[in-house]
């Protein structure tokens, strides 16, 4: 019998494992991908907006070479934290069901577990926001961006104007790619990193990167893409489409467990903010998942406290 079963091995899932260990509780972390899978799926050359200190968990120092750490530095930090604290983490194992009996029976793709308590720290990176247009299922369409080399010398359309979309556009352009951006709004977003925003705006102004504002993709074909623009329909020759339009948490999974969701307020789950316990006794939420569709509400720095709240509530129950 496990005291705490944690679903998700992201930074906050790891923080929950550390907090459980500190309180003398037995725990296991189940992760369907690799360690800190969301971070692993970030672009290869990504630099965080946050400083190293804001990515730290459990007051374990994050020493980086620069004030703003890279993806590789973050991966190394969380690997080191997990290994040095001997956390029990099962990777590439997907949770299929959580059922409340006397305790919780958790069925995964590899095994069955019994746990007194379950913590859900699954983040929001699982489900991409789809374009819902014909041709989106073609292999050329991707919702995650990794390495710009893949798009060198190719015609790539990037949908969106977020940090990830802008980074992808600039990196692919500098690897010799032919880049066009399709943006619903009238300009590059104000939340784009301040040191990157002038770069993308200047590349667009000089014509190195094409940009179609107030525009949407209407159809994706094997060799071309149709775009609805203020000037009418345009057809662009195209090899790849990177639809970097954001992601959302797997709320269906939560509702199957019995967790109530407020569909009127960003589909936020109903939980006690003092203990992080949901309406299902013994099931807790931690991290960005707590914000429902409002995925910018919680992040590593301000949701670490969730781990401490959860374990403080579990310990007296025995």
What are these regions (language model features)?
Residues 1-12, 154-159:
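Beta1/beta-strand and adjacent pyrophosphate-binding region of the FAD-binding site
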Residues 3, 26, 155, 177-180, ...:
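Residues at the starts of beta-strands that form the adenosine-phosphate
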Residues 9-85, 166, 170-194, 263-266:
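Beta1-alpha1 glycine-rich phosphate/pyrophosphate-binding loop at the start
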Residues 86-99, 105-107, 112-114, 174-266:
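A Rossmann-like FAD-binding core segment of flavoenzymes
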Residues 121-122, 159, 242-245, 286-289:
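Short, well-ordered coil/turn residues at beta-beta hairpins
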Residues 122-175, 265-274:
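Glycine-rich dinucleotide-binding loop and its adjacent helix/turn
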Residues 136-150, 247-297:
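FAD-site-proximal beta/loop scaffold in flavoenzymes
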Residues 286-318:
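A conserved FAD-binding loop/helix module that cradles the flavin
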């Amino acid at each position: 019998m496990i005291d705490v079963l944690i679903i998700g091995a992201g930074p906050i899932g790891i923080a929950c494992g550390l907090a459980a260990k500190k309180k003398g509780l037995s725990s296991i972390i189940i992760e369907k991908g690799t360690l800190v899978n969301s971070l692993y799926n970030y672009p290869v050359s990504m630099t965080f907006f946050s400083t190293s200190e804001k990515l730290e968990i459990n007051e374990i120092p994050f020493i980086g070479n620069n004030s703003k750490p890279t993806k590789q530095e973050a991966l190394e930090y969380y690997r080191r934290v997990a290994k040095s604290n001997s956390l029990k983490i099962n990777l590439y194992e997907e949770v299929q069901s959580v059922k409340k009996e006397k305790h919780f029976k958790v069925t995964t793709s590899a095994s069955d577990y019994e746990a007194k308590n379950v913590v859900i720290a699954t983040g929001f990176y699982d489900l991409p926001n789809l374009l819902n247009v014909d041709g989106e299922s073609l292999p050329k369409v991707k919702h995650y961006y990794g390495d710009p080399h893949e798009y060198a010398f190719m015609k790539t359309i990037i949908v969106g104007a977020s940090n990830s979309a802008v980074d992808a556009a600039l990196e692919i352009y500098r690897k010799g790619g032919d880049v066009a951006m399709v943006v619903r709004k009238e300009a590059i977003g104000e939340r784009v990193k301040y040191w990157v925003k002038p770069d993308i705006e200047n590349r667009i102004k000089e014509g190195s990167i094409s940009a179609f504002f107030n525009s949407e993709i209407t159809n994706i074909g094997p060799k071309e893409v149709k775009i609805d623009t203020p000037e009418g329909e345009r057809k662009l020759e195209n090899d790849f489409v990177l639809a970097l339009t954001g992601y959302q948490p797997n709320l269906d999974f939560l509702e199957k467990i019995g967790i109530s969701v407020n569909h009127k307020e960003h589909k936020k789950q109903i939980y006690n903010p003092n203990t992080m316990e949901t309406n299902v006794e013994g099931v807790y939420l931690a991290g960005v998942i707590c914000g429902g569709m409002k995925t910018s509400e919680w992040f590593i720095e301000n949701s670490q406290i969730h781990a401490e709240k959860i374990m403080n509530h579990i310990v007296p129950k025995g």
